UniProtKB/Swiss-Prot annotation:
Superkingdom, taxonomy of origin: Bacteria
Main localisation: cytoplasm
Organism from which the protein derives: Pseudomonas fluorescens (strain Pf0-1)
Keywords from the named record: Cytoplasm, Metal-binding, Zinc
Protein name: Protein SprT
Family annotation (SMART domains): SprT
Any GO molecular function: zinc ion binding
Source taxonomy: Bacteria, Pseudomonadati, Pseudomonadota, Gammaproteobacteria, Pseudomonadales
Keyword match ATP-binding: no
Cell compartments where the protein resides: Cytoplasm
Family: Belongs to the SprT family.
PROSITE patterns: ZINC_PROTEASE (PS00142)
Every SprT-like domain range: 14-156
InterPro entries: SprT-like_domain, Uncharacterised_SprT
Active site (UniProt): E70
Length: 164
C-alpha cells in the first residue's frame, strides 16, 4: 500500500474531525479496484478501494481530489446516515467546506483499455475469419467444436492471432 495514499486518507479524516469537532472511524484502505472507477467507498463496510493504475498515472491529482472524494462519502455517511444522495448536499458540503475542493462527481483520467487477443478460425467454404476469444479458443482445445453456419463444417484454428 503506497504510504502517500494512507497519509492522505488520514489527513482527510483529521481535517473532517477538526471541522466537525468529533472523531470518525477509520476505514480499511485497499488498492483492489480495476476498470474505469478511480475509487469506491463502501459505506457499510467502512472500506475504501482505489484503482492502483489510475493512482500511478495521476498521483498528484488522485491524492488531492480522488482520495478526498471517497473519504467525503464515508464522512457524510457517518454524519448523516443512509438517507442521503451519494453526491448530494451533504457530500458537497464536505467537499467544499472541509476539503475546499470542487465537488466533482467524475474523474477525467485517461483509462487505457486492455488489449484482447483474438484467435482466428476459418472454414473451408467461407472466405471470412471467425475471431474467437481466449476462452472460446481454450474450449476448442478441450474438445468443443464450433460449426460454420453455412456449410456446417467444423471451424479450424488458422494459427493466426490478432491483438485488438
Amino acid at each position: 500500500m503506497p504510504e502517500q495514499l494512507n497519509t492522505r486518507v488520514e489527513d482527510c479524516f483529521q481535517l473532517a474531525e477538526s471541522f466537525f469537532k468529533r472523531p470518525f472511524k477509520r476505514p480499511v484502505v485497499s488498492l483492489k479496484l480495476r476498470g474505469q472507477k478511480a475509487g469506491v467507498a463502501h459505506l457499510h463496510e467502512n472500506l475504501l478501494r482505489f484503482n492502483p493504475q489510475l493512482y500511478r498515472e495521476n498521483t498528484e491529482h488522485f491524492l488531492k481530489q480522488t482520495v478526498a472524494h471517497e473519504v467525503a462519502h464515508l464522512i457524510a455517511h457517518q454524519l448523516f446516515g443512509d438517507r442521503i444522495q451519494p453526491h448530494g448536499e451533504e457530500w458537497q458540503l464536505i467537499m467544499r467546506g472541509v476539503y475546499e475542493l470542487p465537488p466533482d462527481r467524475c474523474h477525467t483520467y485517461e483509462v487505457k483499455r486492455r488489449s484482447v487477443t483474438r484467435y482466428i478460425y476459418k472454414c473451408p467454404c467461407a472466405d471470412s475469419d471467425f475471431p474467437f476469444s481466449a476462452q472460446r479458443h481454450s474450449l476448442v482445445r478441450q474438445g468443443r467444436r464450433y460449426l460454420c453456419r453455412r456449410c456446417r463444417n467444423t471451424l479450424v484454428f488458422s494459427g493466426e492471432m490478432r491483438v485488438e
